[in-house]
Amino acid sequence: MAVTKLVLVRHGESQWNNENRFTGWYDVDLSDKGRSEAKAAGQLLKDEGFAFDFAYTSVLKRAIHTLWNVLDELDQAWLPVEKSWKLNERHYGALQGLNKAETAEKYGDEQVKQWRRGFAITPPELTRDDERFPGHDPRYASLSDKELPLTESLALTIERVVPYWNETILPRIKSGERVIIAAHGNSLRALVKYLDNMGEDEILELNIPTGVPLVYEFDENFKPIKRYYLGNADEIAAKAAAVANQGKAK
């Protein structure tokens, strides 16, 4: 039986990744480097013989534009795509827009690490009258008050990502379609934790690099049997380490 594969791609570097700012649901675009990363991811997938039947992404343009660039390199720009807020980055609450290193200088490296990587720890909440509250954004007009976050932990992100996986994405994979997901560091960490049944301490140390294809292989029961990145292992490790260091004081 042929091995079933799934490809995950964290968006390429965004303008605020470059500025080391907490982004969350703020809709910043890719940097020039991020666009290059996305194109390189597409070329890697092409070189490895990947092609897809369906794509999923968030409603944030850094993920959408990453997917565009990947599919363009694969000559699959025509591919059907479903966009869902459930694949958005985790909401960073009142930290959105703040510089990570400056925040670490103010609150300490460990506090910022817990905000960034702690499983059930939420950053400080937004207020509903804050311009950053997603209820002011027309793309979220159909969401209920309960669905509109003021802040999120990874645990809360899992509560929206995993049902979307089980109810929407997995059935398509089970039907035989080849799927790619372009999303965000924490929405993908949420999915990886679920798929690999990771503990809270283990997920704390997982850093997903920007613009690198992450391939899952599944058995006939759609249980993961292998997870690996495409590309140069040393470069990928360096990029993951850079992600880990973003939240440290200078």
Swiss-Prot record:
The record marks H184 as: Transition state stabilizer. Its EC number is 5.4.2.11. Substrate binds at residues 10-17, 23-24, 62, 89-92, 100, 116-117, 185-186. CDD domains: HP_PGM_like. Pathway: Carbohydrate degradation; glycolysis; pyruvate from D-glyceraldehyde 3-phosphate: step 3/5. One of its GO terms (biological process) is glycolytic process. Gene3D superfamilies: Phosphoglycerate mutase-like. Catalyzes the interconversion of 2-phosphoglycerate and 3-phosphoglycerate. This is 2,3-bisphosphoglycerate-dependent phosphoglycerate mutase. It comes from Pectobacterium carotovorum subsp. carotovorum (strain PC1).
